[in-house]
Amino acid sequence: MNAESCSLILSYISSAPAGNLVLNCTATTNKQTLEANLKSAVYQRYPEFLEDWTNVCVHIIHSYFPKDADYWNVDKLYTSVNRITTLEQSKVVGKEIKNGFTFDAENSTASLENDLQPQFRSHALFMVGSAGPLFSSTARTSRLDSRLPDGGIIAKPVALLPTPSVANSQEYTLDKLSPPSTAKPPASVIEFNPSLAKLPTVKYLQSGPFSSIAPYKNSSSSVIPDSSFHSVACYRASSHYKEAPVEKSIDIDIIQNNLSLLEEDSWTSVPIQGELVELNKLLQHLQLLQNQRITSHNVLSDEERQISVQVQNLILKLAKDYDMSPEDFLMDDFTLSLTQYGAFYRGTLPLSAQPLELPSQQLLRSQSNAALRSNSLSMNGSLSPSSTNVPLQSYRRTTKSRR
């Protein structure tokens, strides 16, 4: 690199928009301005000039931001001067390794010296969201600017890899570094099935001080009313014998002839005694849990819910195994009346203030009593005891009796 080359480079830089800004910078090796070094032809070789040229441009780039005009003017000037210097250097020295690039004097093309290491080209902001990793658009900065984009405390900067080529499939890509988010695996424990919840039953009423005479339940909203409630504790013996399988050694005609001797209303529970005992234990345990929950005002526990499901499944199993329909084991005298805690009042209803007899009936009865007294005096000569003149129905209740 001679003095003529230095003067040509000086004239080209000074004609650029940001030339004076670069020439007056002192970020060189000897702490002199770049203009002074070019005028005095300090640089004997192109690598010496390129080293100071890069340091000066990096220093100025870090003094500005991408939104400033001088930031991009210096970036364009650095690229053009670096390209011109590289071409001049290739003409003089032929082939020379420079900054990791191999320059060919014939076609003046640059290729990467080491393709194994990924070359970072840009940066972006990265954050983890509810739907997976989120990336911002690439930051438009100069290659000389080593500052990372600032995302504050929300996002962090991340370097972006170049687009992978078809020939080299071993390069790291963004998909390999940050795979897409997958759905959360399902829970191993299955929650309670709402379809097994108990059906709406009878609603009990609170009438306050009138609980002794007012209705205590309302079955209009229940799925299974009182009249359709059936028991699976027993079944008709005749229906069981008709549907039961008969061994070949037994005469079927004898059984068929004796079916009429069985009492149609007879009941039996021997074959399902074990299931009934288990059902009774579950019902007792369920009643104990319900009483504890009602007295302590707690929410429905999982144990109580599971026991109710077991009771429901056991009842369905009994009905299915013995092929019973609701009409088969209907009990007419079965009641669903349950004990309900409420206000208790001692005493009786007040007496009726007015007798139930009409005045004409009362007058007729008085006259008959007087006639009886006169007959008794004429026969015995003395007054015999007789009933008082009190209406017979004066102590009857005026309200309807409770049942």
From Swiss-Prot:
It comes from the Eukaryota. GO terms for cellular component: chromatin; cytosol; nucleus; RSC-type complex. GO terms for biological process: chromatin remodeling; regulation of transcription by RNA polymerase II; transcription initiation-coupled chromatin remodeling. Component of the RSC complex composed of at least arp9, arp42, rsc1, rsc4, rsc7, rsc9, rsc58, sfh1, snf21, ssr1, ssr2, ssr3 and ssr4. The complex interacts with histone and histone variant components of centromeric chromatin. The modification Phosphoserine is found at residue 384. Residues 376-389 have a biased composition (Low complexity). It is found in: Cytoplasm; Nucleus. The keyword Phosphoprotein applies. It comes from Schizosaccharomyces pombe (strain 972 / ATCC 24843). Component of the chromatin structure remodeling complex (RSC), which is involved in transcription regulation and nucleosome positioning. Controls particularly membrane and organelle development genes. This is Chromatin structure-remodeling complex subunit rsc58. Keywords: Chromatin regulator, Cytoplasm, Nucleus, Phosphoprotein, Transcription, Transcription regulation. The keyword Repeat does not apply. Residues 376-403 are annotated as: Disordered.
